Amino acid sequence: MAREWPMTHPSNHPMDHHHQTLQAHLASQGADADCAAVIEALADAARELARQIAIAPLSGIDEGAATVNTDGDIQKALDIVADNLMREALRRAPVAGILSEEGDRPETVNEAAPLCVAIDPLDGSSNLQNNISVGTIFSIRPRGRDVLSSFFEPGTAQRAAGFFVYGPQTCLVLAIDRRVDLYVLHPTLHEFILAKSGIRIPQDTPEFAINASNRRHWSGAVRNYVDECLSGAAGPRGRDFNMRWIASLVAEAYRILMRGGVFLYPADSRPGYREGRLRLVYEAHPMALIMEWAGGSASSGRARILELSARSPHQRAPLIMGDVRLVRDVDMLHEGVEPLFETSDAPLFARRGLFR
């Protein structure tokens, strides 16, 4: 039976309303039963993963020997723990196949099941020793003619998407049925409780997030955008911008949802980065769905992320996401730019700007 829990204010005075559990809210909103079962399975795994992350400095699991996964990324002991927890939970749900960052190819679970899940079990694990928020990112999509091809459909095929954040609070941001909701894990009830429904990205926030240390590798279009922001009120944009960079995709996305602004992880000229660095299927696609259903946008700089299809399970893509107008500004600077990467003094980029 779906449950509702009375909440208690930190002052120990009861609040004047009830907050629904994840299970109760999904049921009350008429969510598809199969999608709901997958989301609840992921929430079960996230509860245990949050516990293990919280005690990692005491258990030593965050100091385990690092290996390299099939995609060439450093894999910590907690990455493997997270992957195992998520897979075990999903095997009990109506899931045909699982594509994880930690595996080479999709795992077939039950070919007769209706859904497939793409997942980054522990995004940003390198941040753990610095006590920075990390997360789990997931995409739920219908099973196609076979498990592998299901993950090669465009992002518009997704039925739901979301991410867990393991930080000051453990929370779930969930995009389902064209809305985005926030749930927080109650520390004593051990339930994900609805905290905010129908999230909309605040508009016109003058903030951008990018790793500025890579400036020398950026395309001229990205350099021009950042330079115009940094020029402040005296520059072509006529206002002062703040710059953010947490180096945690889930934390950056959460901030965008709460505060607005734009996040950029563009392609750059380094080997292995020319098609972007984030994975399309289990990072860019789910983030794009969340952004769009919260009234924002997500682009590669040249195309809508949700219209892109992967050619391989771990294909990478650039990601620019956030406020519709700010994302559009970045896109406009990319229009007609071929090739994308030029020397910093190329005449095209010396002249081209959004306002000139």
UniProtKB/Swiss-Prot annotation:
Cofactor dependency: Mg(2+)
Region (Disordered): 1-26
Alphabetized HAMAP family for the sequence: FBPase_class1
Broad class of where this protein is predominantly found: cytoplasm
GO biological process: fructose 1,6-bisphosphate metabolic process; fructose 6-phosphate metabolic process; fructose metabolic process; gluconeogenesis; reductive pentose-phosphate cycle; sucrose biosynthetic process
Organism domain of life: Bacteria
Chain sites annotated for binding Mg(2+) 2: 120, 123, 283
Reactions listed under catalytic activity: beta-D-fructose 1,6-bisphosphate + H2O = beta-D-fructose 6-phosphate + phosphate
Keyword tags: Calvin cycle, Carbohydrate metabolism, Cytoplasm, Hydrolase, Magnesium, Metal-binding
Family, per entry: Belongs to the FBPase class 1 family.
Species, as recorded: Bradyrhizobium sp. (strain ORS 278)
Protein name, per record: Fructose-1,6-bisphosphatase class 1
NAD listed as a keyword: no
Residue positions binding Mg(2+) 1: 101, 120, 122
Annotated cofactor note: Binds 2 magnesium ions per subunit.
Keyword hit for Metal-binding: yes
Protein EC: 3.1.3.11
One GO CC term on file: cytosol
Xref: CDD domains: FBPase
Associated pathway: Carbohydrate biosynthesis; Calvin cycle
Record text on subunit structure and interactions: Homotetramer.
Compartments reported by the entry: Cytoplasm
Disulfide bond annotation, renumbered to this chain: none
InterPro entries to which the protein is assigned, alphabetical: FBPase_C_dom, FBPase_class-1, FBPase_N, FBPtase, Fructose_bisphosphatase_AS
GO molecular function per UniProt: fructose 1,6-bisphosphate 1-phosphatase activity; magnesium ion binding
Binding site for substrate: 123-126, 211
